[in-house]
Amino acid sequence: MQTDAPGDIPAPTPSPDHRAARPARSRRTTRPGGGPSLLAPGAARDPYRLYRVLREEHPLSYDAPLGAWLISRYDDVVTALTGPEFTGFPHDGAPRGGPAPLGLCHGSTGCLPRDRYTVVTGFVPRRLAERVERTAYVLARRIAGRRQADLVEEFCHWLPAGTGPFRSPLRTGDAAPADEGPCTRHTGLRETALASFLANLLDDPDLLAALRVEPTLAGRAWTESMRRDPPVQVVLRRTLTEVTLSGGTLPARAPVACLIGSAVRDPERFAAPDVFDPFRRDQADATTGPAGCPAVVLGRLEAEQGLRALLDAMPRLRWADGFRPAATGLLTRGPRSLLVRPG
């Protein structure tokens, strides 16, 4: 496993680790540039052990097989996603301060406020909301009479696909809709996020019972699922200038892999980060994507309406006998199958 810095990119300058004094963070340090590779065997099957090693021992390291610097701590990742010293990768012409492809957002500039107008945050056209609800109930009722079903194949795939196009109005009153972009055309991330959301809830029968009584809790459960199990695990960025992070200083024009899946499990930011807890006080707000992105808005709506339809059609919904969900993937991650007993 290659651990040296590449010949054409200078090694980072070590900087004091301001986290080292905290008990939760290991005091061990290694030479910047050394560390395990994101492409190591087994990383896609269980990346969280690798993430922990990177956060504690190699917060800034160059991954030669990947060809990028790895950053894994929450504060560092948020800096790379939002700071003006970073831009999109590999397109250096991406707008500064533009949204990174994060959460359910593909990074479309249409997801940002503009000088002429502002996208209505959290707004869903009434007809679209009705179509999401109708599609969710049709799919749920098709599954309800079966002895066993796969929610990924028979529900999570079809609900986002059946939602149709999203055209957001403009807050200024301009009648022209916002342009469609990749966030509205592509549904794969919403499918993956919905599958992780349902897996987290089915793993907790008590929480599922609480949601039957109080459906409004679904919003908090969705936010927590997006934190604990984000569909996009790695986002690539590029530095515009030298940038100092907790593990050292990155050179200008350096490719950087932001390990979202590691950042959202950082114990310096989240208490008991591996636990799915919709009632936590420290819910994530910086790694879910722009609030005005249509994919972000639709994903939440599909999760809330989809869960309600499933519970209405199948009050005794539970895992199939002997089944345990398993997430897979490195760049994007989620369960590929959710076998359930509808009744």
Predicted feature residues:
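Cytochrome P450
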Residues: M1-G343
